[in-house]
């Protein structure tokens, strides 16, 4: 089964390829011109479905039968900030899009509330389209957001997030350690199990 991922983000592609190591994984831009997808859903799940459907609609009938389409939408939510940045995690600081600016804005917003660390959680929603049908799964990772980032690994908000039961930030962890506990890894593992059950049923 070939898996077509609705992203051009190399970090995401690498993480997905590790989980689906027994499948051929490729970004959608490898078979079509990249295009802008308007993510105007009101939840992570809605945005994941929007992305998957946008790719599906551009495939030929032959390619729709050849590929499983997999998309995700994910982000960090901080209860102290009434759930921000949430679905706006990737564009929290506005244009031009920048992970560093997003990170700094979240730090500043937490600081404004007089906190040095506060509960936070990541959500990952995955949407799969297989033979025209849409399936979704979710994964979560709970922990704390801190205002003093640590570590150079990972991406996004990783240097300021400490997973539950850990003393290190995601930015201080090896990729293999992060992938064992991350919200996206949990959702991907569920997606893999779902794919296995679907292909067995169809077989």
Curated annotation (Swiss-Prot):
<dbReference type="GO" id="GO:0036222">
    <property type="term" value="F:XTP diphosphatase activity"/>
</dbReference>
<dbReference type="GO" id="GO:0035870">
    <property type="term" value="F:dITP diphosphatase activity"/>
</dbReference>
<dbReference type="GO" id="GO:0009146">
    <property type="term" value="P:purine nucleoside triphosphate catabolic process"/>
</dbReference>
<comment type="subunit">
    <text>Homodimer.</text>
</comment>
<dbReference type="InterPro" id="IPR020922">
    <property type="entry name" value="dITP/XTP_pyrophosphatase"/>
</dbReference>
<protein>
    <recommendedName>
        <fullName>dITP/XTP pyrophosphatase</fullName>
        <ecNumber>3.6.1.66</ecNumber>
    </recommendedName>
</protein>
<dbReference type="GO" id="GO:0017111">
    <property type="term" value="F:ribonucleoside triphosphate phosphatase activity"/>
</dbReference>
<comment type="similarity">
    <text>Belongs to the HAM1 NTPase family.</text>
</comment>
<feature type="binding site">
    <location>
        <position position="178"/>
    </location>
    <ligand>
        <name>substrate</name>
    </ligand>
</feature>
<comment type="function">
    <text>Pyrophosphatase that catalyzes the hydrolysis of nucleoside triphosphates to their monophosphate derivatives, with a high preference for the non-canonical purine nucleotides XTP (xanthosine triphosphate), dITP (deoxyinosine triphosphate) and ITP. Seems to function as a house-cleaning enzyme that removes non-canonical purine nucleotides from the nucleotide pool, thus preventing their incorporation into DNA/RNA and avoiding chromosomal lesions.</text>
</comment>
<dbReference type="GO" id="GO:0046872">
    <property type="term" value="F:metal ion binding"/>
</dbReference>
<dbReference type="InterPro" id="IPR029001">
    <property type="entry name" value="ITPase-like_fam"/>
</dbReference>
<dbReference type="GO" id="GO:0009117">
    <property type="term" value="P:nucleotide metabolic process"/>
</dbReference>
<feature type="binding site">
    <location>
        <begin position="183"/>
        <end position="184"/>
    </location>
    <ligand>
        <name>substrate</name>
    </ligand>
</feature>
<feature type="binding site">
    <location>
        <position position="73"/>
    </location>
    <ligand>
        <name>Mg(2+)</name>
    </ligand>
</feature>
<feature type="binding site">
    <location>
        <position position="74"/>
    </location>
    <ligand>
        <name>substrate</name>
    </ligand>
</feature>
<keyword id="KW-0547">Nucleotide-binding</keyword>
<dbReference type="Pfam" id="PF01725">
    <property type="entry name" value="Ham1p_like"/>
</dbReference>
<keyword id="KW-0460">Magnesium</keyword>
<feature type="active site" description="Proton acceptor">
    <location>
        <position position="73"/>
    </location>
</feature>
<dbReference type="GO" id="GO:0000166">
    <property type="term" value="F:nucleotide binding"/>
</dbReference>
<keyword id="KW-0378">Hydrolase</keyword>
<dbReference type="GO" id="GO:0036220">
    <property type="term" value="F:ITP diphosphatase activity"/>
</dbReference>
<keyword id="KW-0479">Metal-binding</keyword>
<feature type="binding site">
    <location>
        <begin position="155"/>
        <end position="158"/>
    </location>
    <ligand>
        <name>substrate</name>
    </ligand>
</feature>
<dbReference type="InterPro" id="IPR002637">
    <property type="entry name" value="RdgB/HAM1"/>
</dbReference>
<dbReference type="GO" id="GO:0005829">
    <property type="term" value="C:cytosol"/>
</dbReference>
<feature type="binding site">
    <location>
        <begin position="7"/>
        <end position="12"/>
    </location>
    <ligand>
        <name>substrate</name>
    </ligand>
</feature>
<keyword id="KW-0546">Nucleotide metabolism</keyword>
